[in-house]
Amino acid sequence: MREVQDEASPGGDATRDGHADEGTSAENAAAEGAARTDAAGTTGLIVGADGRTRPLWAASDPLLREYYDTEWGMPVRDEQGLFERLSLEAFQSGLSWVTVLRKRPAFRVAFAGFDPEVVAAFGAADVERLLADASIIRNRMKIEATLQNAKATLALRDEGGLASLIWSFQPAQTPRPEHARDVPSSSPESIALAKTLRSKGFRFVGPVTAFALMEAVGVVDTHLLGSHRRGSSGVWS
């Protein structure tokens, strides 16, 4: 998932950067050129045409830019929202995050809006249906893990719920990275979270995936200090 840290991108895999849609506009091409120029700089940040400062990965594709500006790092505290993000982080493993974002609408249809009660009731026929659905990422292990994770999510309700568990691993302090290379790919808290999730029956979640989840839902803030989104979650000052 984040085995190779790439410009502090969500999930951080090496394929995340440089996968723009076909027909990239002149504006995006210019932004990418600026990104390449800035790559030798000291921050790993670029200033977009709108005057806002972002990390390189968030400037490489319009969909990533929108995701960065509106979603990534904002607090998610509801069960369904967290189950969706945990599921998508697992599906992203080995792939680029922009691929997941492009397929997210189809994922939501295929997995009933990531309602854990519905997904937990999926059976063998549903697995075959999902494997035949070209609009999503067709990987049997990831699909079966998602079904198991839905069941584990329901079981957690007797212990306070998925949101309570994930947010209980919020650290006392969040990273304050000045450059993309300063962003960690895991932490003591993500190691502990992954271990706890696995003990509760969750699959396809390790320390790196757990940290990417924590970043995505605001448990930690790894926005670079010079980014226009730093501190936007309201969780960290």
Task: Please state what every model-predicted region is.
Residues 1-28, 32-237:
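HhH-family (HhH-GPD) DNA N-glycosylase catalytic core used in base-excision repair
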